[in-house]
Each structure stands twice: as C-alpha cells, then as structure tokens.
C-alpha cells in the first residue's frame, strides 16, 4: 500500500466563516492556522497547500486574557534608521482590528512561499458583514 500524497490540482477547498466575538485571540488563531494549513484533513500533505478559506467576522470583539490589553505590543519598522514603531493591543484593536488577528495567525504559519499562499486564504473583517456570500461559507464553531 502506498502513502497518499495530495496533488495541488485535486485539493478540495471549502469556505468557512468564523465569528471572533468573545473569542480568545490565541485559541482562535491556532485553530484558524490549523485549518489554513489543512491539518484537519486526512489528505494533509506538508508540501501541498491543502487548507480551506477562512473568513473571520467581528474582529474588533476578540479578547485577550490578563493585562495584555495594555502590555501586549506590536512592532513594525519604517525602514529609516531609528524607525522602530510600536503600538499596544488596546490602540491597535481600535485603529485596525483586522491586523490583530492577521498578525497572530501569520506568526503561526510557515515562513516560506507555501505559508504566504496559506495566509492569502485568510479574510478578516470588522463587523458582522463580509463580501464572500457568493462562496456560501459554512459557519465554523471554535
């Protein structure tokens, strides 16, 4: 008996919608990353993108535990000398709530071209509406 390896052209991808309201950031992000990679499927193959599309709604209502609302910092660099910028969770969730979930999930995906392809299948939106109703996403309880 041979080991099954998935082919990119035969992978069946589904669309799922996840409601982030009241969810803990890390627990939500790990399950999303797992599904983007396709590790929940029996035909998972490490070198093939077997994951599903994930649409996250209500990104502004995601929660963190402890004092992370004020203590958790997000960093980026402008590219100029001394151009390190930082913003805490509380300010970032008010400014760009999508980036909080995107950053958490991106850190859990592989840092290579395959991981970037997986990351492109993540769609995060503030509020309860999203433009992917034509794909008929199934609701995913996490």
From Swiss-Prot:
Identification of the protein by name: Large ribosomal subunit protein uL13
GO MF annotations, alphabetized: mRNA binding; structural constituent of ribosome
Similarity remark: Belongs to the universal ribosomal protein uL13 family.
Subunit structure: Part of the 50S ribosomal subunit.
GO biological process: negative regulation of translation; translation
GO CC aspect terms: cytosolic large ribosomal subunit; ribosome
HAMAP family reported in the protein's UniProt record: Ribosomal_uL13
Keywords, sorted A to Z: Ribonucleoprotein, Ribosomal protein
NCBIfam families named in the record: rplM_bact
InterPro entries: Ribosomal_uL13, Ribosomal_uL13_bac-type, Ribosomal_uL13_CS, Ribosomal_uL13_sf
Keyword Transmembrane helix: no
Record function comment: This protein is one of the early assembly proteins of the 50S ribosomal subunit, although it is not seen to bind rRNA by itself. It is important during the early stages of 50S assembly.
């Amino acid at each position: 008996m041979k080991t099954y390896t998935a082919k990119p052209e035969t992978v069946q991808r589904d669309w799922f919608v996840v409601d982030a309201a009241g969810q803990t950031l890390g627990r939500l992000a790990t399950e999303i990353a797992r599904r983007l990679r396709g590790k929940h499927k029996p035909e998972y193959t490490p070198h093939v993108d077997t994951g599903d599309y994930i649409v996250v709604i209500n990104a502004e209502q995601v929660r963190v535990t402890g004092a992370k609302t004020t203590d958790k910092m997000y960093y980026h660099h402008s590219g100029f000398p001394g151009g390190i910028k930082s913003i805490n969770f509380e300010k970032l969730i008010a400014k760009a709530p999508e980036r909080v979930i995107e950053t958490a999930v991106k850190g859990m995906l592989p840092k290579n071209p395959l991981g970037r392809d997986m990351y492109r299948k993540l769609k995060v939106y503030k509020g309860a509406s999203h433009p992917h109703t034509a794909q008929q996403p199934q609701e995913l309880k996490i």
